[in-house]
Amino acid sequence: MMMKGTVTHQESFLNRIAESLGRERRKSGVSLPEWKYQPQYQTHAGCTEDDLVTMLKDHCVNIHTELIETDAAGLYDALRTQVNRFEGGPVIIPKDSRFETYGLQTLMTEEWPDEGIPVWEWDAEQGAKNIEKAEQANVGITFSEITLAESATVVLYASEHAGRSVSLLPTTYIAIIPKSSIVPRMTQASDILKQQIRDGVTVPSCINYITGPSNSADIEMDLVVGVHGPVKAAYILVNDR
């Protein structure tokens, strides 16, 4: 769990800036400007849910990520098949009640372990052992909180029950994407987070935007995959969730 930080010398720092600007500190009466032009809200404004799915599919091709479409009833088989295609376990998952809600709990806790596929569920009390398990894992599996159709990006919230290592350190990565999580682009994702803050929801201090497998390029534009994360990634789109 991340330690709570403290802010020191904030007042003196801000006072010094105001003094350098030749004015008094403004502590009230400051509001966000109303921008005359906000083209970000017009981009993809007329897209339907199905249009966004098509956009997501098309961009998955560009980022070398396979997208599998299914429904809630077919998710079990789709996930099992994809893990087999990634050559099995070990598997690591966050502590997330959606695995049970989506009918995957038996697969995680009984069937895969009985078949010799270890499954590690993130356990905050185990500390650094979670990172060791993530390093040893062949497949990391998470749910996408928000999905950006324009860039085929999944958004993950890190927490004490879902460390960043789950999607970063395994050799391969699978994101389960509820169709209802798809939005056009970063604009809408930012609005969702801002609304959560206005509603008093505690927003995670670590929010990760993941676009397919790890891709890097050197100065000669030679693509190298897997240097900073998984070598392969797949998205499983659940059409009725």
Curated annotation (Swiss-Prot):
- What superkingdom does the record give? Bacteria
Per the record, the coiled-coil ranges are: none
One annotated GO biological process: lactate metabolic process
Q: Name one Pfam family in it.
A: LUD_dom
Gene3D superfamilies from the xrefs? NagB/RpiA/CoA transferase-like
Query: Function of this protein?
Result: Is involved in L-lactate degradation and allows cells to grow with lactate as the sole carbon source.
Its family?
Belongs to the LutC/YkgG family.
Give the protein's recorded name.
Lactate utilization protein C
Q: Which organism is it from?
A: Bacillus velezensis (strain DSM 23117 / BGSC 10A6 / LMG 26770 / FZB42)
> Which gene is the coding source of this polypeptide chain?
lutC
